[in-house]
Regions:
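Hydrophobic/aromatic interaction determinants used to assemble and anchor large protein complexes
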Residues: 51-58, 81-83, 89, 123, ...
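Substrate-gripping "pore-loop 1 plus following alpha2 helix"
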Residues: 104-118, 145-146
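Conserved P-loop NTPase catalytic core
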Residues: 7-40, 44, 118-190
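Conserved P-loop NTPase "ATPase switch" module shared by AAA+ and STAND
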Residues: 79-109
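Flexible beta-alpha connector loops of hexameric P-loop NTPases
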Residues: 30-31, 60-65, 99-111
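Generic recognition of flexible, low-complexity loop/linker segments
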Residues: 14-17, 74-81, 86, 118-121
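Short glycine-rich substrate-engagement loop in P-loop NTPases that contacts/grips substrate
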Residues: 54-77
């Protein structure tokens, strides 16, 4: 939201952030070691989050859906009835660990990747955005060669933003470990 802008020191980043500040409701979730399909994990998280912000929507059961795009369109219609001027951003962490575990489940990962592909399609036409954190270039990983075709179709629908080690070092040094003058004085005195 706009109140977070004061914490941004880099002028270009701050200007870019102003354009979207407060324009999205944000669901952040971490996928743990789960047996559920990616579809069911994300749908359950979405339904719970939407309910917590006053949006009433239930996805149809997985066995009744032939394409999730219509379900997302209906979800966003319900969302916009309550928040007409905002979008919905879903941020998922640890997606790579989840997908790695799913590679051993045969066709399960293909269904998960198909669901991701549908999410990518939805993002193009709705005020819905999806962001996932992975620790390696999953689209080029040898671990997923057996589902390379499915991965390619997912890749075509998402923009990748690689983060280099130098980027991580910068964030740690400038954001996490940076000290104020008062903090530095206390450290020196100690």
């Amino acid at each position: 939201d706009a109140s977070c802008l004061d914490g941004i020191r880099h002028p270009a980043v701050k200007d870019a952030a102003k354009q979207i500040a407060g324009r999205f409701k944000v669901l952040r979730t971490v996928i743990g070691a789960a047996e559920k399909s990616l579809r069911n994990l994300l749908v359950d998280e979405l339904v719970e989050y939407l309910s917590s912000i006053g949006v009433n929507y239930d996805f149809p059961p997985a066995d009744k859906v032939t394409n999730h795009i219509r379900a997302f369109e209906d979800m966003m219609a319900a969302f916009h009835a309550v928040y007409p001027d905002q979008g919905l951003l879903v941020v998922v962490d640890e997606l790579l660990d989840y997908l790695r575990a799913r590679t051993e489940k045969g066709e399960a990962i293909v269904l998960d990747l198909s669901f991701l592909r549908e999410i990518g399609e939805v993002c193009k036409g709705l005020n819905f955005r999806f962001m996932a954190g992975v620790q390696e270039a999953v689209f080029d990983s040898h671990r997923f060669q057996h589902v390379a075709d499915s991965l390619r179709r997912v890749k075509d629908r998402f923009e990748q933003i690689p983060i280099a080690r130098n980027d991580v070092k910068f964030v740690v040094a400038e954001r996490l470990l940076r000290k104020t003058a008062d903090q530095l004085a206390k450290i020196r005195d100690h």
